[in-house]
Every structure is written in C-alpha cells, then in structure tokens.
Curated annotation (Swiss-Prot):
It is found in: Cytoplasm. This is Serine--tRNA ligase. It comes from Dehalococcoides mccartyi (strain ATCC BAA-2100 / JCM 16839 / KCTC 5957 / BAV1). ATP binds at R252, R253, E254, E339, V340, S341, S342. Catalyzes the attachment of serine to tRNA(Ser). Is also able to aminoacylate tRNA(Sec) with serine, to form the misacylated tRNA L-seryl-tRNA(Sec), which will be further converted into selenocysteinyl-tRNA(Sec). Keywords: Aminoacyl-tRNA synthetase, ATP-binding, Cytoplasm, Ligase, Nucleotide-binding, Protein biosynthesis. Belongs to the class-II aminoacyl-tRNA synthetase family. Type-1 seryl-tRNA synthetase subfamily. Consists of two distinct domains, a catalytic core and a N-terminal extension that is involved in tRNA binding. The lineage of its organism: Bacteria, Bacillati, Chloroflexota, Dehalococcoidia, Dehalococcoidales.
Length: 413
C-alpha cells in the first residue's frame, strides 16, 4: 500500500508509475475521497466542538440544539465511515512504485537478460520433453491425476515423488545451513487479512481458491503467510534483518492462463515451492535483494543446469514489487527457458499493509520495514529442467550429484 500523503503530494508521479506498469489504478477517485474525508473530518470536529460548548449550557434552547447536533454528528460519522471504507479499498488497488533503476517496458517481451550461466548440453540425440520421459519411466501419472482432480493436476510416483522430495530437502538444507534462513512451516489455509497484507487481495481474488463458508483462503505462495508472521508488530533494529524460508504447496486457479501450457507439469493448480522471505531496514533492502538472487542462483549452480538472469521491466514486475529479477532454467526437451524464481524487493508496500514496523532506538518513532520475497526455487519447473537436462539416450535420468544423498540412487530407469 502506498502512503496516502505520498499520493496526495505526488499525484502525477503515481499516475506515471501506474502508466509505466501498463495497468490502471483509481488515483483520481482516491484524491476525491481523500478530499471528502478531510472535509467531513473538519466538519465533524467543528460540530463536536460546538456540542461540547452546548453541553455546558442548561437552558432549553441549548438542550434542543444539542439534540440536533447529535443527529448531525451521527449522520456525518456514518458518511465518514463509508468514505473511509471506500478509500481503503481503493488504496489497496494501487500497485507499488517501480524503483528508478527498473527499465520501462510495455510487457515481458522487453525484459532485459543480464547474463547467462552454464553451458547448454550438446545432445547426441533429440532430447524428449519431460512428459514423455516421465510416463515412460512411470514416475509421472497424468491420467490418474486428471481422474482424481481434473485438468492441471498430476501424480508423482516412486522415484518421481522421491526426486521432488530430494529437491525440496536439498533447497531447505542449503538455505538454512549455508545461507542462514530460519525455516518456517506455515498453514496452507490463511485468513483474508493475510492476503490483503501480502497484496493478493482484493485485486487478485479471481486467481485464488477460497472456502467461502469459513472465509479461509488457500495459499497461492508461502509469501502470503510469511508476510504476516510479524503483522501489527514493532520490531527492534537489532532484530533486523530477518530471513525466512518455507516449503509449501501453492494453489492457484490460473484463470489468466487458460489454454496455455496444457501439456506436462509447467503450469498447474497445485504445485510446490520453496520460498525465501526477508524483513529488513529500508536502507538495506536493495542489497538484500542482490543477496537473495545469489542464494537462489546457488541452487541452479549446484544442480549444474544452465540458467539466465533477467531484470523485469515496469509492466512485468508484480503488483507489490518495486524491483524484480527472474531466474530461468533451460529445459532442452521443451526448448524453453523456464522461470524457476522471481525475486522482488517490495520496499515498504507490504510492511505498510501488514503494519510491520521497527524502531531504530527505544525512543525512536516506528518506521515501516522493507520486505523481499523470492522462490528458492519453484517446483515442478526445476523438476522439468532436471529430468530434461539429465536424460540419457536410453530414456533413463541421471541424478545430479548434489541430490544423490537424498535419493539413494544415481539413476532413474
């Protein structure tokens, strides 16, 4: 959420930021509601002051005028409450301001590749896509996944399930033991206010799964619960930075992706992900972003899979982000660069929505923290890259060395 005072004092800057994102936001309506709110507040203050004076007088005229004032105050309080509710809703629909270092671009086609790491493998045969390899090895079962849950669901079997478990364990171990993140295992169902704080609600409700009876929401990413771990808290400067890592399943309706990537396990309603999350001081957040990217890249380096880093343009960064990078692994069977991580600095956008603050000293005024999030990494796209990059001419899959202690085998046949 943006500071209302900032919008009031910098309306053209905010309008330009929204335009650079190639989206829309109700800036004019916010300014009108803000003006109405300020006028109503002033009018209420005047009436309350007048009523206070009348309360000290005992004559019939003053008593009658006091009754009239009570009615007027009640009416204005109701109007102010409605204006406040509308204003809050509209503010929640305004995206974050892109950092000046973010390139302006109209869509993802203009994202900037910063560098490539690792060499693409030279195959002596035509590499197969993961769905062919998975079915032939009996480690992925699409038909039974559809039988159980419908399209965009699948089942991992035997060594396939073990490979995913090995990847998750390896990632969590690396991030907790080497990168010093604290592991969290959060609930998969969270309250509405958690998703408001993370920025998923109200704007993206259509892409979320919801239990309407009890108003629980299935997590679209561990970012949502991690944003709320310190909601409505005031931290000390000594506690920052805080680094969390969490593995969860993630649930998304993918309504915007209807008809896309229908084969394989690239785009699903349920998938698994290891998420990195940071709380830090404002002056440290961009350095923390670079560290987060390096932490995520180390997974790809360890797996020895070619990848590239992209800086996202203004129109492609997420709703709450001020600056984002994507890590994409190369998958030869589908001949695609697959996004396996998006690392973002959300500055104080989520901190303000979640009301997470810190004090630099015990007497200092509380400030909003900056928050960052990133995949470290996202499955099953990492699975796709492992299966396709490590396939052999006979259809078997060699297990990357770093995963062998978790798998107990060197090859899936």
């Amino acid at each position: 959420m943006l500071d209302l005072k900032f919008i009031r004092e910098n309306p053209e800057l905010v309008r330009k930021a929204v335009a650079d994102r190639n989206t829309d936001a109700p800036i004019d309506e916010i300014l009108e509601l803000d003006n109405s709110r300020r006028n109503l507040t002033q009018e209420l203050d005047n009436l309350r002051a007048k009523r206070k004076i009348m309360a000290k007088q005992r004559d019939e005229t003053a008593i009658e005028e006091g009754r009239v004032l009570r009615g007027q105050i009640s009416t204005l309080e109701s109007e102010l409450s409605q204006v406040d509710e509308k204003l809050t809703d509209r503010l929640l629909r305004v995206p974050n301001i892109p950092d000046p270092s973010v390139p302006v671009g109209k869509d993802e086609s203009e994202n900037v590749v910063l560098y490539y790491r690792g060499e693409k493998r030279n195959f002596s045969f035509t590499p197969k896509p993961h769905w062919e390899l998975g079915e032939a090895l009996d480690i992925i079962d699409f038909d039974r996944g559809i039988k159980l849950s419908g399209s965009r669901f699948y089942i991992l079997k035997g060594a396939g399930a073990r490979l995913q478990r090995a990847l998750i364990a390896f990632m969590l171990d690396l991030h907790t033991r080497k990168h010093d993140y604290t592991e969290i295992y959060p609930p998969y169902m969270i309250k509405r206010e958690c998703l408001v704080a993370s920025g998923n609600l109200p704007k993206f409700a259509d892409n979320l799964y919801h239990d309407a009876e009890e108003d629980y929401w299935w997590v679209p990413t561990a970012e949502a619960p991690l944003t709320n771990l310190h909601r409505d808290e005031i931290l000390s400067a000594e506690q920052l930075p805080i680094h969390y890592v969490a593995y969860t399943a993630c649930f998304r309706r993918e309504k915007m992706s209807a008809g896309k990537d229908v084969r394989g396990i690239k785009r699903l309603h349920q998938f698994d992900k290891v998420e990195l999350y940071k709380y830090c001081k404002p002056e440290d957040s961009f350095a923390e972003l670079e560290k987060m990217v390096a932490d995520a890249e180390e997974i790809a380096d360890a797996l020895k899979i070619p990848y590239r880093l992209k800086q996202l343009v203004t129109a492609d960064i997420s709703f709450g982000s001020a600056k984002s990078y994507d890590i994409e692994m190369y998958s030869p069977g589908v001949d695609e660069w697959l996004e396996v991580s998006s690392c973002s600095n959300c500055t104080d956008f989520q901190g303000r929505r979640a009301n997470v603050r810190f004090r630099r000293t015990s007497e200092a005024k509380p400030e909003f923290v900056h928050t960052l999030n990133g995949s470290g990494l996202a499955l099953p796209r990492v699975m796709i890259s492992v299966i396709e990059n490590y396939q052999q001419p006979d259809g078997s899959i060699v297990i990357p060395e770093v995963l062998r202690p978790f798998m107990g085998v060197d090859v899936i046949r």
